[in-house]
């Protein structure tokens, strides 16, 4: 005997209206994640090139 599987999604007519804000929110999260990754990569590059200067400047500004 073969069993048939069905996939249910959403609530019918409301799919188009509710997908808009969720899709926009997802795009915003992806953009923020991408921006954060870019910033962290930039920080890594600076630290690789002149970590000593970075640490010295940080300590002079009151860091511990």
Curated annotation (Swiss-Prot):
Keywords: Coiled coil, Isopeptide bond, Ubl conjugation pathway. Residues 24-52 form a coiled coil. Residues 21-58 are annotated as: ARC ATPase binding. There is a cross-link at residue 64 (Isoglutamyl lysine isopeptide (Gln-Lys) (interchain with K-? in acceptor proteins)). Is modified by deamidation of its C-terminal glutamine to glutamate by the deamidase Dop, a prerequisite to the subsequent pupylation process. GO terms for biological process: modification-dependent protein catabolic process; proteasomal protein catabolic process; protein pupylation. Pathway: Protein degradation; proteasomal Pup-dependent pathway. Residues 1-38 are annotated as: Disordered. It comes from the Bacteria. Residues 1-11, 25-34 have a biased composition (Basic and acidic residues). GO terms for molecular function: proteasome binding; protein tag activity. The modification Deamidated glutamine is found at residue 64. InterPro entries: Ubiquitin-like_Pup. Belongs to the prokaryotic ubiquitin-like protein family. Protein modifier that is covalently attached to lysine residues of substrate proteins, thereby targeting them for proteasomal degradation. The tagging system is termed pupylation. The N-terminal unstructured half of Pup provides a signal required to initiate unfolding and degradation by the proteasome but is not needed for pupylation, while the C-terminal helical half of Pup interacts with ARC to target proteins to the proteasome. Strongly interacts with the proteasome-associated ATPase ARC through a hydrophobic interface; the interacting region of Pup lies in its C-terminal half. There is one Pup binding site per ARC hexamer ring. This is Prokaryotic ubiquitin-like protein Pup. It comes from Nocardia farcinica (strain IFM 10152).
